[in-house]
Amino acid sequence: GTPCKCHGYIGVYWFMLAGCPDGYGYNLSCPYFLGICCVKK
């Protein structure tokens, strides 16, 4: 996915998702335009 920033971390942008997908170990997220930014801290 596309890199994105969330609370000072670099995360992955997921298009057209309301929440981060399970199984990737994400524990931080930020709402983004038409999607969400998910971060593994």
Curated annotation (Swiss-Prot):
Tree of life domain: Eukaryota
Disulfide bond annotation, renumbered to this chain: C4-C37, C6-C30, C20-C38
Keywords associated with the record: Disulfide bond, Ion channel impairing toxin, Nematocyst, Proton-gated sodium channel impairing toxin, Secreted, Toxin
MF GO annotations: ion channel inhibitor activity; toxin activity
Gene3D superfamilies, per database record: Anthopleurin-A
Compartments, as annotated in UniProt: Secreted; Nematocyst
Signal peptide: none
SUPFAM superfamilies: Defensin-like
Any one cellular-component term (Gene Ontology): nematocyst
Family annotation (InterPro entries): BDS_K_chnl_tox, Myo_ane_neurotoxin_sf
Pfam families reported in the protein's UniProt record: Defensin_4 (PF07936)
Further comment found in the protein's record: A synonymy between H.magnifica and R.crispa is controversial.
Family as reported in the entry's similarity comment: Belongs to the sea anemone type 3 (BDS) potassium channel toxin family.
Function: Weakly and reversibly inhibits rat homomeric ASIC1 (isoform ASIC1a) (IC(50)=4.95 uM), and ASIC3 (IC(50)=17 uM). ASIC1a current inhibition and ASIC3 transient current inhibition are not complete, and reach a maximum of 70% inhibition and 80%, respectively.
Protein's recorded name: Pi-stichotoxin-Hcr5c
Record organism: Radianthus crispa (Leathery sea anemone)
Top-level taxonomy: Eukaryota, Metazoa, Cnidaria, Anthozoa, Hexacorallia
